[in-house]
């Protein structure tokens, strides 16, 4: 700028200014010299030439300015740099002789008409002011409900945080103490991404709802985050226990770490029709207690996840009158799922490429009711297709289970009461195993199952297990 300070963005209506220091280009100590640099934008990729003039005799400091032209198309003959709002700008200069006598190409970049944000934010993020560039943590204060409009692009400076705050002092995060709704549409999504030259997973932290998680996220794409969304630490008091359902729908999470983390939250959740691809967990939910005055619903429907797994632990209402219900339905997962310490579970019409693990280590935390129906389970490694432990009442029906290299068990029931019917179980080491101990008597029904091509056993009953087995088709 005119004060010789580097700028991250040029305001609309301003001019580009370049400063170059190179004492080698001071070829005449008694005269003013000139050098040439090249300018490009994302709109005009063919370089415009800008002649820089030395600031005085024998200074080796060169300056030049160039005007912008806001246009959706480039023109190489107008002596203007054609730009659109949010364009990245680049200046390049070839130093004929660096400190080692070599020719070196040097580049610097800035942006045109980007809205910079850092610190407290109490206004909506609009498409008219997009794109936004967050240079430090942005905090939405309590009692404010903000919106991010459809079509907004939110960029983050990589691996830096000028606020030095939040969970990660070296990465930018959006911290929500009030409410935040991301309101993308199918035709006009919201984008969150790194602003780095070579963007990578973990360049920025994520969105973190804390204290009072009021907000929904729809039709957004997340790139380069450490953790897409965290809902955490809702105070267990009357003012928070009536939170509306939190909805995460129709989002795409790629080139990032983990997807959705939910901890210490008392609110209904709906996670629908999202796409996740990454090395972390698509959903991790733990230490969430149900409301003491109402039922509590956690829905996961219509999602595609190409991640590591889904973990849901302690989604439970410790009350005789109300319960937590977890529904996993119509999803396509290239992994398995693990659930423990909840009240009621329904897992229906999903595709898994990993096992379903349900239950807990003790009967006190056992799941009350389980329905597993209509799923396709294709194992990609040697573990159980369905494993239940300390489940009080379970129905497992109409599932297709295919093992991996004749290893482990298709359906394993430990200290659980289950009705297992009309399943097809093949290519495991054991088709169905049942076990319990003297202190936890159970009774399991095995009806009309097809148990074929398993390596060792069709049905294996051990310890104090008891079964009623009728009309099953069992053969190698």
Model-derived features with residue positions:
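Beta-strand/loop edge motif enriched in small/polar residues
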Residues: 110-476
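Structural beta-strand segments of beta-rich domains
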Residues: 14-18
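Aromatic sugar-binding surface patches on proteins
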Residues: 55-78
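Extended low-complexity, serine/threonine- and proline-enriched intrinsically disordered segments
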Residues: 29-56
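Short, compositionally biased P/S/T/A/G/V-rich stretches that sit at domain boundaries
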Residues: 1-11
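Solvent-exposed, conformationally flexible loop/turn segments
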Residues: 11-13, 120
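Short amphipathic, basic-aromatic surface patches that mediate peripheral association
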Residues: 21-28
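Ser/Thr/Pro-rich, low-complexity mucin-like regions
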Residues: 79-106
